[in-house]
Amino acid sequence: MAQAQYTGTGRRKNAVARVRLVPGTGKITVNKKDVEEYIPHADLRLVINQPFAVTSTQGSYDVFVNVNGGGYGGQSGAIRHGIARALLQVDPDFRDSLKRAGLLTRDARMVERKKPGLKKARKASQFSKR
């Protein structure tokens, strides 16, 4: 029989992560690279592992992620969101703890667009009275 496989899609800023959970040893692979190689910042790797910490399932699943768009921070948030959604398929009873930790909510904050006549979204050139 084929091994159980759970999927979830996570999004954050401009990053989209498609996550596959397979029962295993806890190895995380992002875009066919090891997570330590793909994401150099240790604090962002902690962000990725938050759903496992909340549900006490560390080391229970191998994670295969396909992520594109955004930078390291956005991609880490997208992976976290995808893992949380995939864990819901594993056990619907996880919903309460994941929701309380805020891991199922899509972070809606996006970069504000640049406005014409300004240097950036809100930065204007210095005002001169005379």
Curated annotation (Swiss-Prot):
Is Iron-sulfur a UniProt keyword of this protein? no
* Gene Ontology MF term list: RNA binding; structural constituent of ribosome
Which is a Gene Ontology cellular component entry for this protein? Answer: cytosolic small ribosomal subunit
- Pfam families (UniProt xref): Ribosomal_S9
Give the record's keywords alphabetically. Answer: Ribonucleoprotein, Ribosomal protein
Specify the superkingdom. Answer: Bacteria
Q: What PROSITE patterns does UniProt report for this protein, alphabetically?
A: RIBOSOMAL_S9 (PS00360)
What family does this belong to?
Belongs to the universal ribosomal protein uS9 family.
Q: What name goes with this protein?
A: Small ribosomal subunit protein uS9
Source organism per entry reads: Streptococcus suis (strain 98HAH33)
Taxonomic classification: Bacteria, Bacillati, Bacillota, Bacilli, Lactobacillales
This protein's gene is called rpsI
